[in-house]
Amino acid sequence: RRQRQMCIRDRDIYGVEHDVLKEDIQVIFTKSQFKMYKYYSSWEEYIAMYQNYGCTAGKCNEEESFLPDAKLNYQMLQTLTDISEDEIERLANRSVEKIQKVASDRETMLEVFGASSQYKNKNAFQECLSIYPELLSDPYTKEMLRQIKKNLVKEGKSAKLDLSAKYMFLIPDLYAFCQWLFLGDKDPCGLLKDGEVSSFLYRAYGKLDCLRSPHLYREHAVRNNVVNAETKKWFTPNAIYTSCHDLISKILQFDCDGDKSLVCADPLIIDIAERNMKDIVPLYYEMAKAGAVIVTPEEIFHGLRAAWTGGNIGVISNDITKIWNSDDVDIDAIKILCMENNFCIDYAKTLYKPTRPDHINAKLSQITGMKAPHFFIYAKGKTAHQVQKKNGSVVNRLDKIVPNK
């Protein structure tokens, strides 16, 4: 009853009262989702304009019924500098076993072809292999297997490792949102506490490592996984839900508008990440915001040109990789480059990038002038003279662990 009374008094951003139950409202947009609300006097005016000009809406992303396993990448592993040789070998174990079995074990062959039972949307060739596995002895199939094995070796040596991990949509604790919206609770408790996430898919695991690309600073968000009767009732199965009391969105730099996290349930990587994340706090700085302009062909052109000329984040992320894989990791330099990378990402929207002070530029130029790390031979197809000599960095150590044959 209390909820219904509060619903009656709820107002939209234009001050109009709504009863969510009586009006059978199925979808609620927040102010932040309605980017151009200032240009309309009411929701009804927006609807009229929408219909008058024949506007349509499209889905950019849709939750999949089946989430395939995913792999970590070198950015996520290179930041775990406090790691032993034994731990690296154990992390690489599944990938090494796959390489060793890919030419002899039928189940491994079917898996690398995408023809095993876990894959639902098979193409014609995969269906044939699934129905008649003897095709694995065909000369064409054997040649494909050789190429697959070659790629698996490259992936292993560049830290694309097989671990228990899946990409999931990031969703906030919407129960807390309902408490705020319908009950007027200015400090809602929600279903998740600080340091907690909820993933029904990984309900058998007590802790999860939540990751996101690009992973440039130390951004391993290890959280307790809470799955109970209430979360089962209110949360959908194939997503990762985060707490409204947590700074996880600042660590992973995500918005709740279709962003995904690579959620890893491997106990070993979680132990290593927890050790390396000790005393690490999120990087935070105020970002610029562009002024409003009338949308014209000229402004669209300026925006596109800015995106192409000022948004090259690949150079910066490669410079950060050089530092992580150097003999002396300069954390302060990485922090500065991470900031520059984020300004670069937003440049097409903001048309602003900070200017380096001379002393900072001198320091960074010296560091980033180095060659790429040795494992870029496998990760980026570099030649031996384009990379540094092999050192003892985390990813470079995989070179001797992952077999060539």
Language-model region placement:
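Duplex nucleic acid-engaging cores and interfaces of nucleic-acid transaction enzymes
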Residues: 260
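Short, conserved aromatic-histidine micro-motifs
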Residues: 275-296
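Short active-site loop/helix that positions an aromatic residue
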Residues: 250-252, 263-279
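Conserved small-residue
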Residues: 1-5, 9-249, 269-271, 291-405
